[in-house]
């Protein structure tokens, strides 16, 4: 990151840079990477991550490219690693239209989710706030080391900004961090394997899709070839 050199963005695949597309004022808009057939990922030492202190864990997440998954409020930018947040929020119940069902797509990755939560707890001075569906708490009700809260009602009830305002309102100079549930899993997966996880679940849905479904792909993958495989009205 130009504004914070400690923050690294890593490639989701091994290969070579095919092109760099720039926009106004030479701003980088897109980096096209030609993927190689092998998965030559950098391996990090993670066997003792549970024994790391806050600063050591921050360095591990920064060096491995996992830090950009953590965002801060206000403004919704990448979290400043030099700050300690007032709280960290993870909402597993989204109410915006066509949002994926995290209880479904993360059903087989609950241990990685738990590990990700445990890591986030090291970065703040209080347990993570974990939002769950009031009518169907599902797999997330048994997550330990969190402050559970329930979400009900129509959109925008699932908007995490509303949850922050209710549970940890921001005063002048305060920062609250938020993490997407699937990115919590990616953090946990990294802490289990030592490798950056590029996996991303995409919902192919909408009125024009005859057979909506979830697709597991890689972060940054071009979506048009995937969409072309579906019958559209």
Spans of features found by a protein language model:
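Generic structural signal for buried aliphatic residues
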Residues: 1-2, 223
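Generic structural motif
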Residues: 2-4, 9-19
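Buried, small/hydrophobic-residue-enriched core segments of structured protein domains
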Residues: 7, 21-225, 229-233
